[in-house]
A protein has these predicted regions:
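Short, Asp-centered acidic motifs that coordinate Mg2+ and/or phosphate
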Residues: 77-78, 110, 142
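Conserved core of the PLP fold type I
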Residues: 1-102, 119-123, 127-132
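Walker B catalytic acidic pair
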Residues: 115
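Alpha-helix termination/capping residues and helix-transition junctions
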Residues: 20, 73, 110, 135-138, ...
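Conserved Rossmann-like nucleotide-binding pocket used by diverse enzymes
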Residues: 48, 112, 143
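Active-site PLP attachment segment
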Residues: 133-170
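A short helix->loop->beta-strand "cap" motif at the edges of active sites that frequently abuts
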Residues: 24, 45, 104-110, 138-139
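Residue-level marker for buried hydrophobic side chains located in beta-strands
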Residues: 83, 111-112
Length: 170
């Protein structure tokens, strides 16, 4: 279930090309990594943003009601999820990822999970792989990883994906 990709954005492009049509909407949290914005628009899809909200302590949180509303209103069946989040740096807790995946499942939405920053978390924070939180996440998520952030190897462009569902993988 692990295979090579020509960079995370190359992998994202491959998934967009295989599972969406030009003009389809893709759900993306904002603020968003500029690479996602360019890749989605260059592939001909449109972006529907679900803004992250700061709570009373200044911690970025997902707005699950907004996600659900946007998925339904725009008939979205593919979302990009960034964990840890880029550019906010937020390391999502298991319960937050579980709740996001419940929203995606309710809307029959596939998920691209960019986990390229998974090795770089501050003390007291632990990266939870998206595919580990429930069965839906395990079977409906394209998870992307790369050594480029951890080991400063961006020039090598290599990355890999983990896809457990053989239909999605093939």
């Amino acid at each position: 279930a692990i295979d090579y990709e020509n960079g995370v954005l190359g992998g994202v492009s491959s998934v967009l090309q295989a599972f969406t049509a030009p003009g389809e909407a893709i759900l993306l949290h904002s603020p968003a990594y500029i690479g996602f914005i360019g890749t989605i628009t260059n592939m001909g899809q449109k972006i529907v943003y679900s803004p992250l909200k700061k709570d009373e302590q200044g911690v970025w949180r997902m707005d699950y009601e907004d996600m659900d509303k946007k998925l339904k209103e725009n008939h979205i069946h593919l979302a990009i999820f960034c964990t840890p989040h880029n550019p906010c740096g937020r390391v999502w807790e298991r319960e937050e990822i579980e709740k996001a995946m419940e929203v995606y499942e309710k809307n029959k939405c596939l998920v691209i999970s960019d986990e390229i920053w998974s090795d770089l978390t501050l003390e007291g924070h632990k990266h939870i792989p998206t595919q580990s939180v429930n069965e839906y996440a395990h079977e409906h998520t394209f998870a992307f990883y790369a050594p480029s952030k951890t080991f400063n190897l961006a020039g090598l462009v290599g990355s890999y994906h983990i896809v457990y569902n053989s239909y999605l993988r093939d």
